Amino acid sequence: PIASITKIMTLLLTFEALEAGKVSLSDIVPVSEHAYHMGGSQIWLEPGEQLTLDEMLKAICISSANDAAVAVAEFIGGSEPVFVERMNARAKELGMQSTTFRNACGLDEDGHLSTARDVAIMSREMLLNHPEIENYCTVWMDTLRGGATQLVNTNKLLKSYNGITGLKTGTTGKAGVCISASASRDDLRLIAVVLGSSSGKERFAAATSLLDYGFAMFESALVPIPADAPKTLPVQKGEEPTLELCCT
């Protein structure tokens, strides 16, 4: 189990829908009875209440609201089960071989499973292709409903770790206390995934240690390309006689 870290995939599909022009941040997201009945962390959405997609994203990223995550899943997918099918399909595309999603918010459910490696894969996809997520997950406090609802970020590393850029925390009885933490310093970007901690203090300490190790032991560097490096390679029995090479 990975608790609310699940919401990274929910967010990834949402931002992909935004990029494709299928939805916009100003769209109104309706609240169903199903979303209303979500337990755990929430912003106490009422059936029929209408918030913009932008507001729902704030609730998900800052306060880890389960009701908002399910409302968005229903808005994007038509229903939560259909959206979860898309989550699993996307996980397969990304090579997340040990992941199965059963819901869009991360509440404990039989068969809802993943690994630290798979969480890192989807976190990387989110951060690389949709860096605008940082505009949401690095906000410490915000409000909704004209100031009536206060949002406080569940990621305490925002207040204590230099270069932190996100990403998502999670806590349930079966999953324990979890985090997928991301940070950037001097063009080096790292992701640290901690699952199954016994407390928030342990979770943040473990993530801090992992990130500290990464920044101490690695650096970003450009590899020089030799002037005589081949530009193409010959292809035998292929549709094209040569294959162009590029350095990335």
Give the predicted meaning of each segment.
Residues 96-100, 108-113, 117-248:
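Domain-terminus/edge residues, biased toward the C-terminal soluble/receptor-binding domains
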Residues 1-120, 124-129:
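Active-site-adjacent loops and short helices of periplasmic peptidoglycan-processing enzymes
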